[in-house]
A protein has these predicted regions:
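Positively charged n-region of N-terminal signal peptides that target proteins for export
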Residues: 1-5
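Sec-dependent N-terminal signal peptides
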Residues: 6-13
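Active-site and adjacent substrate-binding regions of carbohydrate-active enzymes
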Residues: 17-497
C-alpha cells in the first residue's frame, strides 16, 4: 500500500506541475522612468525600485514577472535608432527619450544603465521572497551589430556570398542583418548562423546564462531558428558557404543540457504559425504564444467561439494568452473601446494555460509604448478598467483558473446566444462558469451547467459583482442558467460550493 505521506507528496507535486502561472510583462527601463515620476526622485537602477511595487504585484496575484530589456546593448543600435522619427507614438519626443532596442543585445550581462549582475540577483531575491518568479529575455535569432563576437568570431553569423555587397542586407564586413522571412532586414542586428555548430554551443551557453539569473526565459521569435524556417530564409547564404542542415533542431540540442541543470525552468516561445507552435512544444517549450486568439478577439463572437471550441485542453495548457504585449498595440486601441478590451481580457485570462498580462493593461491605456523609447505618450488611467482588473485578478487566483480543466458550453439558447461565449473551468472542488457577452448588444442566454450537483434549489455566486442567486438545479442542468448581460459585460459564476 502506498505510504500516506508519499501519496500526499505525489498529489502536491502533480498539483504544482499542473498549475499555470500568471505572468506580468514590464518594460524595464520605461518602468524605472515611470517610477521616477511617480515617486518624485531618480529611479534608474533595479535596486532603486521601491519594495512596495513588488508587494503590489503580489497582492494582485502575479506569480511571474517578465522584466523585458535588462541585457547590455550596443552603441551602434542606439545611434541607429536615434535616426528614426517617433512623432506618431510620442509627440514632442527628444533624443533623450531613445534608449535603443532591447533586442539588439551585445552581451548577456546586465545593462549598466540599470545596474549590475548583482542587481539582477537582488531583483530575483525580492521576487522569490514574495513567492514570485523572474523571467528574462533570450534572443536567439540575432545580436547587436557591434556585439564582441561580430569581430572576434564572424563565422558565428550568416555571411554574404562572395561578391554580394547589398547594404540593405549585409554590413560592411559582410555579415547578414537579422530578419524574418516576411519582412525586410532589421538593420540594428546581425543574424546568428544556426547551421554552424559553434554558434549552437554559444547560444546554448547564452540561454544557460539567462537561466542562471532567472526562473524562466521568454525566447524571442523562437520559430526563426527552426531548421525548416532558417534553411528557407537563408538558403542562398548557407549554400554559398557550404552549410548543410543539422541532424536535429537547435532547441532539442540546447534543452538537453538546459533541462538537466534547470529542470523547473519555464520556457516561453514567441511563435505565430500553428505548425511551429506544435513543433516547439514537442521540442520542449513549456508554453508557446497563442497570437491567433488575439486576432479572433479583435473580431466577432462567432470568430471567437469558432476558434476556441475546436481547441483541446492540451492546447490551452501549453499556450500563453494575451490581449497586449510590447509588440502589439494596446488592447483598448485594437478592440476599439475600453469595454470590448475588458471583455477580451476576461476571455484571454480565463481560458487556461499561461495567463499573460502587460504593464498598463490594467490602466486601460490606449497609447502603445515603443520599445525604443523610455516613455509613452501621457494619458490618464481608466478608473473602471483598473477596478475591474483588481476584481478579476483576485478571481484568477482560484485554482480553477490556474489548473488544466476546461469545457466549452455548446448548447446555449436564448435571444442573444450567438453573441455569448461560455465555458466551464474547474480544479478539484472549485467550479466556475464564465459567460461573456461579446457584442455591443444587451441580451440574455440560457447556459447549461452539465456538472452542477444536487437537486432542488442551489446557490450560484456571481463573483465579479459578488451577488448570490438561488436557482433550481434541474433547470440549470437541462435548460440552463439564465444570464442577462449588457454589451461587452462578463460574469463569472461559482457553483458546487
Amino acid at each position: 500500500m502506498l505510504d500516506k505521506k508519499l501519496f500526499i507528496f505525489l498529489a502536491l507535486t502533480i498539483l504544482i506541475e499542473c498549475k499555470h502561472p500568471i505572468l506580468y510583462e514590464i518594460s524595464t527601463r520605461p518602468w524605472l522612468y515611470e517610477l521616477s515620476k511617480k515617486y518624485g526622485k531618480s529611479i534608474t537602477k533595479l535596486k532603486d525600485i521601491p519594495l512596495e511595487e513588488f508587494d503590489y504585484l503580489k497582492e494582485n496575484g502575479i506569480e511571474m514577472v517578465w522584466m523585458m530589456g535588462v541585457w547590455k546593448l550596443g552603441e551602434y543600435g542606439l545611434n541607429f535608432d536615434k535616426q528614426s522619427d517617433y512623432s506618431s507614438v510620442l509627440p514632442g519626443w527628444t533624443p533623450d527619450d531613445v534608449i535603443g532596442s532591447p533586442y539588439a543585445i551585445s552581451e548577456y550581462t546586465c545593462n549598466p544603465e540599470i545596474g549590475t549582475n548583482d542587481d539582477l540577483i537582488w531583483l530575483r531575491e525580492q521576487l522569490h521572497s514574495r513567492n514570485m518568479k523572474l523571467m528574462l529575455d533570450f534572443v536567439p535569432n540575432h545580436s547587436a551589430v557591434d556585439a564582441p563576437t561580430a569581430a572576434s568570431n564572424p563565422k558565428l553569423y550568416v555571411r554574404a556570398p562572395a561578391g554580394k555587397n547589398d547594404p540593405k542586407r549585409y554590413t560592411d564586413s559582410g555579415l547578414s542583418y537579422g530578419k524574418d522571412p516576411y519582412f525586410d532586414p532589421w538593420r540594428d542586428v546581425i543574424q546568428w548562423n544556426y547551421w554552424e555548430e559553434e554558434t549552437r554551443k554559444v547560444m546554448k551557453d547564452n540561454l544557460m546564462t539567462v537561466l542562471s539569473y532567472a526562473d524562466g526565459a521568454r525566447c524571442d521569435m523562437a520559430h526563426l531558428v527552426l531548421n525548416d524556417v532558417f534553411g528557407k530564409t537563408w538558403e542562398e547564404e548557407l549554400n554559398a558557404w557550404g552549410y548543410t542542415r543539422p541532424v536535429n533542431e537547435f532547441w532539442e540540442y540546447a534543452f538537453n543540457e538546459v533541462k538537466a541543470k534547470y529542470p523547473n525552468a519555464i520556457l516561453l516561445a514567441e511563435v505565430y504559425e500553428e505548425w511551429e507552435i506544435e513543433l516547439l512544444y514537442k521540442l520542449g517549450f513549456t508554453y508557446t504564444y497563442d497570437k491567433a486568439l488575439l486576432d479572433k478577439l479583435e473580431g466577432t463572437p462567432y470568430e471567437v467561439n469558432d476558434y476556441i471550441h475546436y481547441k483541446t485542453e492540451s492546447f490551452w495548457g501549453h499556450t500563453a494568452h494575451f490581449v497586449e504585449n510590447h509588440d502589439e498595440n494596446r488592447a483598448v486601441f485594437n478592440m476599439g473601446s475600453v469595454e470590448k478590451a475588458k471583455a477580451a481580457g476576461t476571455v484571454a485570462a480565463t481560458l487556461g494555460g499561461m495567463i499573460f498580462m502587460n504593464h498598463g493593461q490594467w490602466s486601460g491605456y490606449r497609447n502603445k509604448l515603443d520599445v525604443h523609447l523610455r516613455r509613452g505618450a501621457d494619458e490618464n488611467e481608466d478608473y473602471g478598467t483598473k477596478k475591474y482588473y483588481e476584481r478579476l485578478m483576485k478571481i484568477l487566483q482560484d485554482p480553477a483558473f490556474t489548473g488544466t480543466n476546461y469545457y466549452f458550453v455548446y448548447n446555449m439558447s436564448g435571444d442573444r446566444k450567438d453573441d455569448f461565449i461560455a465555458y466551464l473551468r474547474e480544479e478539484g472542488d472549485s467550479h466556475y462558469l464564465v459567460v461573456v457577452n461579446y457584442s455591443n448588444n444587451s441580451g440574455c442566454a440560457n447556459v447549461p451547467i452539465y456538472n452542477i450537483e444536487g437537486n432542488g434549489d442551489h446557490t450560484v455566486h456571481e463573483v465579479v459583482d459578488d451577488v448570490e442567486y438561488i436557482r433550481n438545479v434541474d433547470t440549470i442542468r437541462n435548460e440552463g442558467l439564465t444570464v442577462c448581460l449588457n454589451g461587452w459585460q462578463s460574469q463569472i459564476f461559482k457553483y458546487n460550493y
